């Protein structure tokens, strides 16, 4: 069995005040000069999934995801990017395991900037850099996860999960960190009562100070 999906996602923050022109040339403050702008990230996702092996109680499946990214910061900056994700998942009667490679192509965003002469002057006088162009890179990461569903009775079960986020871009402030690989663990529990009531709890964002 195969599945094909198309998704469009938007994350945005609207009505952000732009105070670049707040101060007039005579150093007076004019609040009427405050305008607002929007920061938005758009992503077009093309997804494909395939069952590799299916039995009565188990299933092994594979999926790949291609994403086209468009980012916009008001009228100041825009970026286009592209990336790939892939994953493999095994599901048993009570257990499931998965591995996902995010940004396996090293997702990039190529930024371009546009400022008016007045905005450039304000940035210069306030000792800010005036960007021209840049490339933002998201390095590959590997996510490992597994879970087991414990039966506590005829109508109650407890699902326990453990995930590990592996990054390869140097030492991070995670519990397990090294110059080559850093590991960020995550734990979760879900109590299921009669398939009607669910209670979830989890813990993540374990950190340690980098010396």
What are these regions (language model features)?
Residues 1-211:
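Subset of outer-membrane beta-barrel
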């Amino acid at each position: 069995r195969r599945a094909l999906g198309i998704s469009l996602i938007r994350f945005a923050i609207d009505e952000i005040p732009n105070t670049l022109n707040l101060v007039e040339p005579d150093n007076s403050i004019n609040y009427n000069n405050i305008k607002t702008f929007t920061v938005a990230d758009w992503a077009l996702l093309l997804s494909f999934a395939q069952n590799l092996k299916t039995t009565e109680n188990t299933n092994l499946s594979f999926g790949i995801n291609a994403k086209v990214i468009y980012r916009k910061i008001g009228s100041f900056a825009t970026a286009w990017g592209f990336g790939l994700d892939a994953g493999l998942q095994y599901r048993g009667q009570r257990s499931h395991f998965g591995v996902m490679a995010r940004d396996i192509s090293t997702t990039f965003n190529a930024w371009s900037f546009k400022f008016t002469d007045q905005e450039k002057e304000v940035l210069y006088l306030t000792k800010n850099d005036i960007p021209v162009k840049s490339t933002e890179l998201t390095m590959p990461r590997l996510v490992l996860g597994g879970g087991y569903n414990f039966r506590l009775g005829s109508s109650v079960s407890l699902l326990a999960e453990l995930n590990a986020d592996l990054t390869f871009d140097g030492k991070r402030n995670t519990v397990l960190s090294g110059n080559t690989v850093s590991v960020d663990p995550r734990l979760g529990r879900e109590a299921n009562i009669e398939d009607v009531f669910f209670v979830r709890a989890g813990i993540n964002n374990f950190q340690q100070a980098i010396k």
